[in-house]
Swiss-Prot record:
<keyword id="KW-0460">Magnesium</keyword>
<comment type="similarity">
    <text>Belongs to the transketolase family.</text>
</comment>
<feature type="binding site">
    <location>
        <position position="378"/>
    </location>
    <ligand>
        <name>substrate</name>
    </ligand>
</feature>
<feature type="binding site">
    <location>
        <position position="177"/>
    </location>
    <ligand>
        <name>Mg(2+)</name>
    </ligand>
</feature>
<dbReference type="InterPro" id="IPR033247">
    <property type="entry name" value="Transketolase_fam"/>
</dbReference>
<feature type="binding site">
    <location>
        <position position="283"/>
    </location>
    <ligand>
        <name>substrate</name>
    </ligand>
</feature>
<dbReference type="GO" id="GO:0006098">
    <property type="term" value="P:pentose-phosphate shunt"/>
</dbReference>
<feature type="binding site">
    <location>
        <position position="48"/>
    </location>
    <ligand>
        <name>thiamine diphosphate</name>
    </ligand>
</feature>
<dbReference type="GO" id="GO:0005829">
    <property type="term" value="C:cytosol"/>
</dbReference>
<feature type="binding site">
    <location>
        <position position="491"/>
    </location>
    <ligand>
        <name>substrate</name>
    </ligand>
</feature>
<feature type="binding site">
    <location>
        <position position="499"/>
    </location>
    <ligand>
        <name>substrate</name>
    </ligand>
</feature>
<dbReference type="Pfam" id="PF00456">
    <property type="entry name" value="Transketolase_N"/>
</dbReference>
<feature type="binding site">
    <location>
        <position position="209"/>
    </location>
    <ligand>
        <name>Mg(2+)</name>
    </ligand>
</feature>
<keyword id="KW-0106">Calcium</keyword>
<dbReference type="InterPro" id="IPR005474">
    <property type="entry name" value="Transketolase_N"/>
</dbReference>
<dbReference type="GO" id="GO:0000287">
    <property type="term" value="F:magnesium ion binding"/>
</dbReference>
<dbReference type="GO" id="GO:0005576">
    <property type="term" value="C:extracellular region"/>
</dbReference>
Length: 700
């Protein structure tokens, strides 16, 4: 634990010359509002918001370039509260700074319908750049924002001197001990150093307290040394009240352009709560009436009043609105001059901000003739990306060290990064479009979210479907935010083959479909893959993330695939030859991905027995379920109860479509190491097995 002498030193104020009583009053107002808000609702995290009051005030009032009247301003700095549990750190600044929150919003913290939920939520509260809460996600996504900032500069103003472009800005982060402990920050921080992201500035709130009290029980590393080892520019500031040290550290960080900056700020959580500061009780619970009253006495507030904000303090802090508009106007002059110099790039920017695609963007998408050589859908996806590359400069992405397997490299594209990281295989350029995440799947997921949140580009990232488990927290958060990240997940079943059960997805499709707002797209062949990419890219921001599920093994190019049908999520691929117009089939075979070919073959076998089967390709359950019921009933007539679902995964998500009398051809156990043909045969994925299931469904 921290000694009393150390606490005294760490809480000794050091203010710059311009600092006045009104600045001190504003900081104390932040502390009191944080204590009052948590006390009123009875739960929350007051301590960090109290001890970080000087830092938050300095960042929002004195450091960041932003405009409270336009929270979507292209030239703004971004702020990421990775320590999302300390949401009051952000909310109170948004209130004091005039971003759209009022005192009543602070008073309604963590209550139904409020603008101030327990953790910051993107799209919910004006001024919140990203949803945070699961620790580590914010810092990792901030790395993506910094990468997106550089790529944006490369698209629109690549030749400007550092700091001279209207597209230059900073990404500021506040991270906690918990963020530092999470593995995703290690992954992302390592990559940030490789990328030399000089516009990324992270404040690490080193208060050494978590829910279980003193972090020494679980964290005893020299974190600053770890970040130096990564290759970051590292500074250490002693004391959360040391505004001089904070400002000097920010200035030093801004001067370093070839490395991300890490500022370890040693604070005392809960300061100035006399009995609970520097304890776990200040971290995640209300302080209690007596302790809150004591805090107010210490800072000169009336202990009997709540939510006190002096009028002169609010007038002072909301001066940020005018200052922000002035900064915006100065930036606009630079931006307008750039627009006059670069009319073509300005037109591109306008298109991206409007979320529009260029005319003819999909004209060169590849098409494969039915019956042509079998092709893995991952290979088809790679061909699609290379065809789209010249038309869509906003599209960029890569893989978690599996580019050759995932087929995620756009033909002819340089790698994104400083030229110094170039290898024999890859040529890196500051503004390249091929991303190399390394074996860092979790960071990749979070970084993709940061890229998309920053805008205005589209990003994708690939790995094996099995390793989507490593990405799941980031994928869920992207779905919660309704952002349009794209995940390319290949090697999608036991069809992966010889690598065996550790790498063969079994439960993954159902597990991913369980995430609300995530669209899971598993095309049947090369053409459905092209149609899937077309649909994904045509969707506007706010339509949610998409996981594109692709095969390792070759699959036949099918007859009857349909672009509109893919966009609807499911469609009639073929009806048995004997069916008359308007006549219903005897049985419906519903399949996805590589198993659609089995349904087609089973349809022929059933026809030999005078059973008329319909084959429905269902690349995306989520898109299909969003269709009007008239369309769904036309594809799956309710009167046809004999149904079979075929998918090389667990059956969990298919019961709703096949009903009690239907059958599911699935796999409910782990696989083995063998070639894919053997595995499919031994585990019952054959046309004969599908036909037999159809006959059972008819008998049910």
């Amino acid at each position: 634990m921290t000694t009393l002498e150390e606490i005294s030193a760490l809480t000794r104020p050091r203010h710059p010359d311009y600092w006045t009583e009104i600045d001190s009053a504003a900081v104390d107002t932040i502390r009191v509002l944080a204590a009052d808000a948590v006390q009123k609702v009875g739960n929350g995290h007051p301590g960090t918001a109290m001890s970080l009051a000087p830092l938050a005030y300095t960042l929002f009032q004195r450091t960041m370039r932003h405009d409270p009247s336009d929270t979507h301003w292209l030239g703004r700095d971004r702020f990421v509260l990775s320590a999302g549990h300390s949401s009051l750190t952000l909310y109170i600044q948004l209130y004091l700074g005039g971003f759209g929150l009022e005192l009543s919003d602070i008073e309604s913290l963590r209550t139904w319908g409020s603008k101030t939920p327990g953790h910051p939520e993107f799209r919910h509260t004006p001024g919140v750049e990203i949803t945070t809460g699961p620790l580590g996600q914010g810092l990792a996504s901030a790395v993506g924002m910094a990468m997106a900032s550089r790529y944006e500069r490369g698209l629109f103003d690549p030749d400007a001197e550092p700091g001279a472009s209207p597209f230059d800005h900073y990404i500021y982060v506040i991270a906690s001990d918990g963020d530092i402990e999470e593995g995703v920050t290690s992954e992302a921080s390592s990559l940030a150093a490789v990328q030399q992201l000089g516009n990324l500035i992270v404040f690490y709130d080193r208060n050494q307290i978590s829910i279980e009290d003193d972090t020494n029980i679980a964290l005893c590393e020299d974190t600053a040394a770890r970040y130096r080892a990564y290759g970051w520019h590292v500074q250490e500031v002693e004391g959360g009240e040391n505004v001089v040290g904070i400002e000097e550290a920010i200035a030093n960080a801004q001067a370093v352009t070839d490395r991300p900056s890490f500022i370890a700020l040693r604070t005392v959580i809960g300061y100035p709560a006399p009995n609970l500061m520097d304890t776990g009780k200040a971290h995640g619970a209300a302080l209690g009436d007596d302790e809150v009253a004591a805090v107010k006495k210490i800072v000169g507030f009336d202990p009997d009043k709540t939510f006190q904000v002096r009028e002169d303090v609010l007038t002072h802090t909301r001066g940020l609105v005018a200052r922000g508009k002035q900064a915006h106007e100065r930036w606009q002059l630079e931006f307008d001059a750039w627009a006059r110099r670069e009319p073509e790039r300005k037109a591109l920017l306008d298109r991206l901000l409007a979320q529009k695609l260029p005319d003819g963007w999909d004209a060169d998408l590849p098409h494969w003739e039915p019956g042509s050589k079998a092709l893995a859908t991952r290979a088809a996806s790679g061909a699609v990306l290379s065809a789209l590359g010249p038309k869509l400069p906003e599209l960029w992405g890569g893989s978690a060290d599996l580019a050759g397997s995932n087929n995620t490299t756009i033909k002819g594209a340089d790698s994104f990064g400083p030229p110094s990281i170039s290898t024999k295989e890859y040529t890196a350029h500051w503004y390249g479009r091929t991303l190399h995440f390394g074996v860092r799947e979790h960071a990749m997921g979070a970084i993709l979210s940061g890229i998309v949140l920053h805008g205005p580009t589209r990003a994708y990232g690939g790995t094996f479907l099995q390793f989507s488990d490593y990405m799941r927290p980031a994928v869920r958060l992207a779905a919660l935010m309704d952002i349009d990240t794209i995940y390319v997940w290949t090697h999608d079943s036991i069809g992966l083959g010889e690598d065996g059960p550790t790498h063969q997805p079994i439960e993954h499709l159902s597990a991913l479909r369980a995430i609300p707002r995530l669209s899971v797209v598993r095309p049947a062949d090369a053409n459905e893959t092209a149609y899937a990419w077309r649909t994904i890219l045509a969707r506007r921001n706010g339509s949610g993330p998409v996981g594109l599920i692709l095969t390792r093994q070759g699959v036949p190019v099918l007859d009857g695939t349909d672009a509109e049908g893919v966009a609807r999520g499911g469609y009639v691929l073929s009806d048995a030859g004997g069916l008359q117009p308007g006549e219903e089939p005897d049985v419906i075979l519903i399949a996805t991905g590589s198993e659609v070919q089995l349904a087609v073959a089973a349809q022929t076998l059933l026809a030999d027995n005078d059973i008329l089967a319909r084959v429905v390709s269902m690349p995306c359950l989520e898109w299909f379920e969003a269709q009007p019921y008239e369309y769904r009933d036309a594809v799956l007539p309710p009167t046809v109860s004999a149904r079979v679902a075929v998918e090389a995964g667990v059956a969990q998500c298919w019961h709703q479509l096949v009903g009690d009398t239907g059958e599911i051809v699935s796999i409910e156990h782990y696989g083995e190491s063998a070639d894919h043909k053997t595995l499919f045969r031994e585990y019952g994925f054959t046309a004969e097995a599908v036909a037999a299931a159809a006959e059972r469904a008819l008998d049910n």
